[in-house]
């Protein structure tokens, strides 16, 4: 068991860390983010006080995002994710948790090529299997949120 643990630990590569602001609802607070490649996923650990909230992006066999409220909790699919490029904020599950992460958003813009250039907002709603069901951009995200609330 220890040998397999060591092997998986060796596969982790820290990409960056930053001190930033996180938010739950209307309450903002300082937090630290560590982004790490772990095997075939990229994990983002958000630390504030004695708490850690983590999200991971999995690309294969399809893009999905999972989160967990602490290191002892299991991973579960997020319901939705939104990006506001103007405020440099990424939010999950109807803004239950948000983080200002300009490093991640710069990567999104670079890796998306022309598709995201000039965009102010992007959003995704995930199905029960974690796969993207609906994607929106700019005013379409506002319209989608209005439709969901009705």
Predicted regions and their residues:
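Bacterial N-terminal signal peptides
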Residues: 1-4
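Cysteine-centric segments in proteins
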Residues: 12-150
């Amino acid at each position: 068991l220890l040998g397999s643990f060591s092997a998986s630990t060796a596969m982790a590569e820290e990409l960056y860390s930053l001190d930033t602001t996180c938010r739950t609802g209307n309450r903002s607070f300082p937090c630290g983010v560590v982004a790490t490649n772990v095997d075939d996923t990229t994990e983002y650990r958000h630390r504030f006080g004695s708490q850690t909230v983590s999200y991971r992006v999995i690309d294969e066999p399809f893009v999905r995002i999972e989160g967990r409220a602490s290191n002892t909790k299991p991973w579960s699919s997020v319901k939705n994710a939104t990006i506001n490029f103007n405020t440099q904020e990424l939010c999950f599950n109807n803004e239950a948790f948000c983080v200002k992460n300009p490093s991640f958003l710069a990567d999104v813009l670079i890796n998306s090529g022309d598709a995201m250039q000039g965009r102010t907002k992007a959003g995704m709603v995930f199905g029960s299997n974690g796969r993207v069901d609906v994607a929106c951009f700019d005013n379409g995200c506002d319209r989608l949120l209005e439709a969901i609330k009705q």
